């Protein structure tokens, strides 16, 4: 557990590193500033996350966690600083770079008119065109998230915990090198939360 304080701004992070050698930098942020009018959401943020790490941003609501994630994903324009993913500057048109990232947003983003399996196949298909390979990846994601018994169900019929697992399956099915999650366990029961956290640990070791 690391605690840091800079210019009156504090952050508490939960950090775990796998492997003994110095792994490659996945996310490198320098001097990142983001303002909303008179409100400074990110104040000269410095961050380096390396391959094999599980890294968590912890803080109260409004502390800038989601803003930081949106800036990393190039969903939000920032005022100053630089963000590099795998050593390359992240830009809105960095499509090849974005293919290596799995995104699990705070709000469940799936299609109500598609079944569990169809949703996973759709999101996987955004990155993987080969049907045979995509079928294998979808099956892997379903098995990994424990959704085998719910493949033909529609999202509206799922519990909160199952929806979260579906959200994760959609984000990781294409086997990305980097997975970014925004509060993946929010509003789920303790049992589902533990399963999700165990799954994240398993992903890190694969």
Give a label for each model feature:
Residues 81-92, 96-97:
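Conserved ABC transporter NBD signature motif
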């Amino acid at each position: 557990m690391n605690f840091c304080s800079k210019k009156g701004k504090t952050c508490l992070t939960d950090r775990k590193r796998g492997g003994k050698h110095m792994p490659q930098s996945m996310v490198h942020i320098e001097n990142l500033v983001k303002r909303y009018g008179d409100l400074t959401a990110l104040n000269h943020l410095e961050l380096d996350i390396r391959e094999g790490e599980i890294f968590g941003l912890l803080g109260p609501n409004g502390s800038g966690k989601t803003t930081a994630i949106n800036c990393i994903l190039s969903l939000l324009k920032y005022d100053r600083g630089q963000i590099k993913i795998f050593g390359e500057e992240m830009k809105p048109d960095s499509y090849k770079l974005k293919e290596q990232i799995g995104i699990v947003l705070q709000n469940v983003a799936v299609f109500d008119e598609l079944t569990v399996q169809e949703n996973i196949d759709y999101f996987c298909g955004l990155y993987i065109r080969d049907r045979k390979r995509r079928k294998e990846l979808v099956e892997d994601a379903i098995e990994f998230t424990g959704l085998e018994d719910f493949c033909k169900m529609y999202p509206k019929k799922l519990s909160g915990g199952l929806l979260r697992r579906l959200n994760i399956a959609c984000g990781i099915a294409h086997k990305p090198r980097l997975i970014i999650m925004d509060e993946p366990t929010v509003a789920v029961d303790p049992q589902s939360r533990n399963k999700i956290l165990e799954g994240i640990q398993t992903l890190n070791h694969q």
